[in-house]
Amino acid sequence: MQSWHSTVLARLARAYHASTNGFERFTGMASTRWRLLFLVHSKGVCTQKDLTLQIGVDAGSITRQIKVLDHEGLVARNPHPEDNRLTEVRLTESGLEAVRRVQEQRAVFLQEMMKGCSAKEIDTFLVVLDRIAGNLNQPDFLQILDN
């Protein structure tokens, strides 16, 4: 086995945690909160079910987080006009201001985080990440555990 095999997951995890922690410290906003606000912003209006599917966490977790955002005045929740089982979520003016503020800070953060990396290196990194994600999403990927 090649030497990088023993460190690739640990290095990837450390880089992810460092970037998430750095983002949260720099912007003052938790990354999960940012993901929710940004998704609602990008969709305009969406259901909590849509958010659950997009983010990939359980519905209860999304509901709790959306309730907090609603209580803080960042989002508004309303029953879906055609299906009362669903709840629509949209940004309030305060939520839109928060998204705009964090988008500006995020751009600065990403610029600093990627400092010293060429455009070619970043493109290669993104290709590798996409390939890893594609491999992990293959239906037969977990068959390696059966061997």
Descriptions of predicted regions:
Residues 43-47:
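Short capping segments at the starts of secondary-structure elements
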Residues 1, 120-147:
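C-terminal regulatory/oligomerization modules of transcriptional regulators
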Residues 6-9, 29-38, 49:
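Short alpha-helical elements of helix-turn-helix
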Residues 48-49, 60, 67, 87:
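Residues within helix-turn-helix
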Residues 1-27:
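N-terminal leader segment of winged-helix/HTH proteins
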Residues 67-127, 134:
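Charged, amphipathic alpha-helical coiled-coil/dimerization segments
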Residues 18, 35-38, 97:
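Pre-recognition alpha-helix immediately N-terminal to the DNA-recognition helix
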Residues 13, 38-42, 103, 130:
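Short, locally clustered residues in the helix-turn-helix/winged-helix DNA-binding domain
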